[in-house]
Structure formats: C-alpha cells, structure tokens
Amino acid sequence: MASSVFSRFSIYFCVLLLCHGSMAQLFNPSTNPWHSPRQGSFRECRFDRLQAFEPLRKVRSEAGVTEYFDEKNELFQCTGTFVIRRVIQPQGLLVPRYTNIPGVVYIIQGRGSMGLTFPGCPATYQQQFQQFSSQGQSQSQKFRDEHQKIHQFRQGDIVALPAGVAHWFYNDGDAPIVAVYVYDVNNNANQLEPRQKEFLLAGNNNRAQQQQVYGSSIEQHSGQNIFSGFGVEMLSEALGINAVAAKRLQSQNDQRGEIIHVKNGLQLLKPTLTQQQEQAQAQDQYQQVQYSERQQTSSRWNGLEENFCTIKVRVNIENPSRADSYNPRAGRITSVNSQKFPILNLIQMSATRVNLYQNAILSPFWNVNAHSLVYMIQGRSRVQVVSNFGKTVFDGVLRPGQLLIIPQHYAVLKKAEREGCQYIAIKTNANAFVSHLAGKNSVFRALPVDVVANAYRISREQARSLKNNRGEEHGAFTPRFQQQYYPGLSNESESETSE
C-alpha cells in the first residue's frame, strides 16, 4: 500500500516539475533584459541606408483591406520583422486564423470585439439564443452557446498575438478600424522558415483581389483556408457533419476574402463597460502584486501564477494617465513591457507611444537591446539616424502612415514639426530600454565633468553646462531652447582642462 502511494506521489511530482518547467519557459523565456531569445538575423546585414516605408501591396476583401509592407526589403529581413496594416469596415469580421510567429497589434482608430482561443481553456462565456421556424413562434427552439472570453478593444490599444493561437476581430463600431500589425519573424517560437505564414480557419486570400501599390514584386500571401486541403469524406467524419457542410468549411467558392461583412451584425455576449473597467482594474492590481512577490522571492517567474486562460491580452497605451514621462511644454512618453503587460514575456516584444507637441524635440538616444519599428500616427517629425561610423543613414521627415526601422544601437534624434507628432514604436524585446544622451538620467549626466571636458576639448564650465543644461527634463524636451553659455565647443580647450 505504501509503495503504491509513493508511486502515485512520484508520478504526480514528476508531472508537476514538467508543467513548472514548460510554463516557465513559455512565459519567461528570458529574465535578463540585456538578452533577447531571438534567433538573430539569417544573413549578414548592412544598415548603411535607411528609408521610410509605405505599404507595397493591397489585398481587398468584402469588408476591408490588408496592406503589406515590403518583406523582401533587406531592412525587414535583417531585423526579422514583418508588418501589415489592416482596415476593417463597420460590421466587418476578420475571420479566425493563426500565424507561425508572434506579433503585436496597435489600434490606430476604431473599436470592436475580438477573441483569442487559447488551447485547453474552458468556455467561460455562456449565452442563449432563441431560433424561430418559418411557421412562427409556436415552434421556436432555444439553444445554448459556450465560448471563450470576448475582449473589447479601442483606439490606442496594444493587443498581443501569440504564435499558433487562433484569433478574430470584429468591428462593432460606426467607423473603420485601422490597425498596424508587427510580427517578429526571428522569434524562437517560429520553427518554420524565416517568414510569416498565416493559417486561415475560414475564408481565403484571393489572388485575383491583390493590388500592388508601387509595382514591385513581393511575396504572395494568398491561399485557401486549412480545411480546403482535407478530403471531404475524412473531414465530414472527423467533425460529424455531412459532405455539404464540409465543403462549406473549405470556402472554395467564397469570394468574400478574409474580411467578411456580417449583414445583421454579430450577437455577442459582452460585459458592460463598467464590468470591463472593474475587471481590468482588478487584473492590473493582481498582476502588480504577483510581480512584486516574484521580485521578492525569486528572480525567475515560475509561470504558474499566470496562464493562457486568465492572462490579459490587451492594454491601452494612449491614456495620458499611464504616461511614464510627461513634460507639459513638450509632450509625453508611454511604454509597455512585460512587467506591465505580462503576456509580452510570451511575445518577446514591447511598445512605446510618443506624443510630441509643436516643435518639441526628443532627447538623442539609442535602443540598447532591441530593434525599433516606428510608425507615424499623426503629424510629422524630422528624424536623423546615425550609424557606428558616425554616418547619417537617415535624415528626413516621417509622415503619417510611414514606417521607419531603426536598428539596435543606432543613435536617433527626432523633432516634431509645427503640427506636432504622435507615433508608436514596436520593439523586438519584451523589456526594451533606451540610453539617452541628454537630460535627467542621461549619459552626459552620468559622466564626470573632467571626462566630458577632455573628451570634447571644452572647459569644465562648458562641460558642467553640457551635463546640466536640460535640468530635470527627461525624454521630451521643450522647443526653442536657449543656450546657457556662449558657443565655443569647437575651440581649443582652455587651460583649465589640462590642469
């Protein structure tokens, strides 16, 4: 008897260890912010000339359009990223699908509902329908539907899309939804070839509906859904349906594309706005407590506090109250990483939203541990990017709808035009951070005065001014800044520097 109990306990303990290890690897692939579990570039890369990108090809559907950026361009291949922009019209449904690589979605405008179907999670949403026959209400029939959680999203939301997890989006608003998707091709979750593959569960991408915007040849992403590849007989047997229904699943004669129009709208069970806010607040508090406990007890996240079924999949980054840095005369900066948004541990990406006021300037910086994909939402910004050779690899104005890839460690300087600017930067690390050259907590502030004075051949007084000119400003700087000392940085150092 004792032997039997011990045997059962041993099996249970082994299973627990296996689950612990797998969940830890899944949700915490890297605890070191200086290291990213990406596979790296698949080729030797030279970032000696950057450019602002716009979508290269469009695929039109019944209720929307998907626009593809040029994935064959060297900059996308070297950074291991893939980008699309998607527009979903009111009552438009982006049919369920999954991809081989993880990504994040930024909602530029609009609102709607979405679902992520995590494998093995229970159907916690239940609703009843009443269906009437053509003969009248006397023969009405009630049926019950159960499904996984439905999430509401709105403008300014960041949505996480794990690899291999089916998802759908629906526009239940009055205006089109515009969203930009950024995928990480080099993520270790991808064990296929180094490119994005989309597996449709319904609908299709019709090749005849494709339209190249600028005439260049890029990779085709058209195809049928996965059911079209199965035999009708085996499919009908596996799903317990007849052959006619099986053929409908294959969508062989469906010309609506991947974004379809729902004539009378979807009947979805959704929590009220108050319930959503209460749930989000409780979830945020729970995650902060869990993160604090993890920091106190262990540097590693064991993966058991959070799982697929309860993890938060969206967060709003546009809310001014969430800003990490705010200057009333210059603008605000808001970032989300895996500490604020734990599912990013699985995605291994993060995001920063910047709102610069008229003529405001961003402190020069470089991305320490990630590439950055900057998408201009509104306004315009002058951007300069410098390589390790001190060469200007980009100097231009970034306009709404344009995308700029900034390689890791390349120095960046940005200044808003007269109308100001707003942009989102998606980064290839779950805990991306930057190193600023000026302002509070900057490189200059951290250097000793004598190091600065001798390095640039300036006086100690000038070095002190260089270190402290921006006072307590951090990130976004006020425009038309007045110099606090006379020009002379290019002159020979004064005798004070050699004392």
From Swiss-Prot:
The gene is GluB1-A. It holds the Pfam family Cupin_1. Disulfide bonds join C45-C78, C121-C309. Belongs to the 11S seed storage protein (globulins) family. This is Glutelin type-B 1. It comes from the Eukaryota. InterPro entries: 11S_seedstore_CS, 11S_seedstore_pln, Cupin_1, RmlC-like_jellyroll, RmlC_Cupin_sf, Seed_Storage-Functional. Keywords: Disulfide bond, Seed storage protein, Signal, Storage protein. Transmembrane segments: none annotated. GO terms for molecular function: nutrient reservoir activity. The keyword Magnesium does not apply. Residues 50-247, 315-464 form the Cupin type-1 domain.
